[in-house]
């Protein structure tokens, strides 16, 4: 072996692509932006995933009387989480190749009794969702999405702020001339959560003697447009997200800025990898789940039993309606999962928060993260060396550009994914996803080259991992 071959050197994806692959990479970037623009919330993302899956020949598992090799099925969990699967030729008890991502992102949720007026305006009270820097959400045009379930059970869809001609919404900030006290606070205290109130109106009713003139006028507008009353907010799920479409960044258009890259970029990469698979040996599964940003709790989060239930349903449909508990356990224990979540990338504006030899970089391919957690690996899923070796060999054998990463310097911070939850099923799990800048900001950055290479990595895992 030559001396130069002894050293491990990372590579840039762009350097490894030929002209045809570069075109495919840039075209995928355009498709990914279109995906993001239709997926501003977890509900809309789930709907877009299902729409694309149906176009590719997937059918709802609820419509199937039996399953056989090559069948393509999906499951819609309450409109907020999705499972896609292409049935393999091997028995499900032999295990599945699973890529698990999440489709929720940090945002501002609207409270259940949110409407009030003050200072000649009408506002909505919010409760932030996930790990946000609160100061990033002020002085920013916002769009409003969600559903309102009326007293009669009718569900009203809300989507305002992103179409041409739509109004936007806004959280005001304090002018610097009067911000002496605010500026003396820490960044986490400068904007309080209870101050993240969204401007939604400013016109009063004509009756100058009426009380709550501005609130009443706004409620009248909502009633005329959507047929709702104030009480209907009690049974509503509304989310404020940054207004605006995904855009290219840079003169060379190599990057994409958008809301929700975490973790819709890995969800998209997994979806693109899965839709073209026809007849795998091992059953392939794409998971697109909710509530990861707040602990993966609830019926649509990964802590729920919906995936176990779906594995049981698939086994039963493949075995004449028969499924035992041990069959489900074997199927899960013999599976391998790539926890498809984003990784923090080296930021040249903040170069001292990571150990750069063990920190991902933009444009260097899918980031494998052996362990997550914080401090002394608290809360981590720590993938076994044997698993890392198998995945590394898979990537090397199929020309996948990869890098390794962890979340910053020891004791600098930390975080987690769904990996540890899935490992509780006794399956092998490793984190592997797209490296990004400005994670959890209203607008985040990823590289088109990394989106392309991550999708290739997931495809090779789906089809060729054993």
Segments (PLM) and residue ranges:
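N-terminal hydrophobic/helix-forming segments and targeting peptides
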Residues: 1-466
């Amino acid at each position: 072996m030559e001396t130069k071959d002894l050293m491990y050197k990372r590579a840039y994806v762009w350097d490894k692509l030929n002209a045809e692959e570069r075109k495919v990479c840039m075209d995928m970037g355009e498709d990914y932006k279109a995906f993001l623009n239709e997926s501003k919330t977890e509900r809309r993302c789930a709907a877009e995933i299902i729409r694309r899956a149906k176009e590719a020949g997937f059918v709802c598992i609820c419509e199937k009387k039996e399953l056989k090799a090559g069948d393509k099925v999906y499951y819609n969990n309450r409109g907020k989480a999705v499972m896609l699967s292409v049935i393999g030729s091997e028995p499900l008890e032999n295990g599945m190749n699973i890529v698990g991502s999440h489709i929720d992102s940090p945002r501002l949720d609207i409270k259940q009794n949110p409407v009030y007026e003050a200072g000649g305006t009408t506002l909505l009270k919010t409760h932030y969702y996930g790990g946000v820097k609160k100061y990033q959400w002020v002085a920013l045009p916002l769009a409003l999405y969600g559903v309102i379930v009326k007293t009669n059970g009718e569900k009203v869809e809300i989507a305002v702020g992103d179409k041409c001609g739509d109004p936007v919404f806004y959280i005001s900030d304090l002018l610097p001339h009067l911000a002496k006290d605010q500026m003396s606070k820490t960044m986490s205290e400068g904007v309080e959560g209870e101050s993240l109130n969204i401007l939604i109106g400013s016109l009063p009713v004509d009756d100058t003697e009426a009380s709550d003139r501005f609130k009443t006028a706004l409620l009248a507008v909502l009633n005329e447009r959507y047929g709702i009353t104030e009480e209907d907010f009690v049974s509503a799920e509304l989310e404020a997200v940054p207004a605006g479409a995904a855009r290219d960044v840079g003169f060379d258009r190599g990057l994409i800025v958008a809301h929700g890259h975490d973790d819709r970029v890995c969800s998209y990469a997994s979806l693109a990898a899965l839709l073209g698979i026809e007849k795998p040996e091992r059953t392939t599964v794409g998971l697109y789940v909710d509530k990861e940003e707040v602990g993966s709790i609830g019926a649509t989060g990964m802590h729920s039993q919906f995936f176990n239930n779906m594995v049981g349903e698939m086994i039963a449909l493949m075995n004449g309606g028969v499924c035992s508990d041990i069959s489900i356990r074997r199927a899960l224990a013999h599976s391998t999962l790539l926890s498809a979540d984003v990784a923090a990338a080296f930021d040249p504006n903040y170069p001292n928060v990571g150990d750069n030899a063990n920190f991902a970089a933009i444009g260097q391919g899918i980031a494998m993260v052996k362990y997550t957690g914080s401090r002394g690996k608290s809360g981590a899923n720590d993938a076994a060396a044997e698993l890392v070796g198998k995945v590394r060999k898979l990537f090397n054998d199929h020309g996948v550009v990869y890098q390794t990463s962890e979340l910053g310097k020891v004791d600098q911070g930390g975080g987690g994914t769904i990996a540890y939850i899935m490992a509780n099923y006794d399956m092998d799990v490793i984190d592997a996803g797209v490296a990004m800048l400005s994670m959890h900001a209203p607008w985040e950055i990823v590289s088109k080259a990394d989106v392309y290479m991550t999708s290739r990595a997931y495809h090779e895992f789906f089809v060729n991992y054993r």
